[in-house]
């Protein structure tokens, strides 16, 4: 077999870089933070559009000044939250301001004063039947400013004179803004006109269309840290198990991802660690506490006889975390490490806050999850979507793979990757080194 030429290798590398950029940043502008890579997207626009449509069912729009990849959702409970530059997550009110501002911008003049934009947003809220307080409270102003700042980051607004941040000024500042209506119109990706309310929009946005299980599973593989089998319908599990090796090769070629295939599910690993906005291990109090917490949870709760049913094991995707155990372990960690590691005073004074934020991070990493109905049981599946595998084929039974009472937390299989131990080197006795152990059985 002939080896690929240097031209072919370079071409594949360029296309892979462009595809990875669009997955990480679905809106790329010619003068935005990724302007250097925008010509690369333009150069391979046709190939990228074809591949994204074929593989993930995503539409790619490439114009002279921007490129927009219209990604789909994954259904209830699977969204990626937006955050301010400080890392503070958007509140429902921030999302409401963002949606209202977008509704104004799609028909706004090319230039608008900040005060006029704010007035139009309040008018749009009235039209939508939403209650927007005009109390002048600083927190309300900062919330509005955060939503407008996101529109500036996306390129839908340009600060021609002044800053959108002046809306939060005590005296009420002014600014001249330039509106890019094309970008504003391209931001919303879901089927708004077909949806009856927010919940229906989330459900319809996740519909993979004619691609069915194939498209949904592929989207889940690239958009989430881990795909567990019980988070898939019977038809999706059947498709994944029969195609997982070929899919691993395809994702390696398209995006440079490496597949980790185990009995409990599949994870796509990015060797360059670029395609994720989550880091664990990480810096900061929450990341440190979460890493130590998950290690101790695994040591306490590791199930016996877990493994692959085909070789005599018992498929275990999640085990219940007893009520009170997380608080108990975090109290121990604060006592052992909190002051020595200079954890933030706010977390040391508020165990409940530390518990909530640590669980939130572990949940986003798919290492723990609140107990509740699953997609394998039909939760979040549109009524028109085919759930059963065809031809009566036998599919992995996941009915007892995750047991817990609704309202409790569940420790998930991938958490075992973060259970560390200390081993002593006998050769020179230089130091004790951390090691990984306890991988989920395959």
Q: In which residue ranges do the predicted regions lie?
A:
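Eukaryotic partner-binding/assembly regions in large regulatory complexes
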Residues: 1-85, 162-177, 181-281
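Short acidic, hydrophobic short linear motifs in intrinsically disordered regions
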Residues: 18-39, 110-133, 227, 308-309, ...
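Positively charged, polyanion-binding regions of nucleic-acid-associated proteins
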Residues: 23, 92-113, 287-320
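Short, charged/polar micro-motifs that form catalytic or ligand-binding hotspots
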Residues: 34-38, 87-92, 103-111, 134-141, ...
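Short amphipathic alpha-helical interaction segments
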Residues: 40-51, 135-153, 347-364
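Accessory beta->alpha helical hairpin/"wing" motif in late/C-terminal subdomains of nucleic-acid enzymes
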Residues: 65-73, 145, 149, 154-209, ...
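Internal, well-ordered domain-core segments that constitute the primary functional module
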Residues: 101-178
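C-terminal functional regions that serve as terminal interaction/effector modules
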Residues: 299-307, 325-442
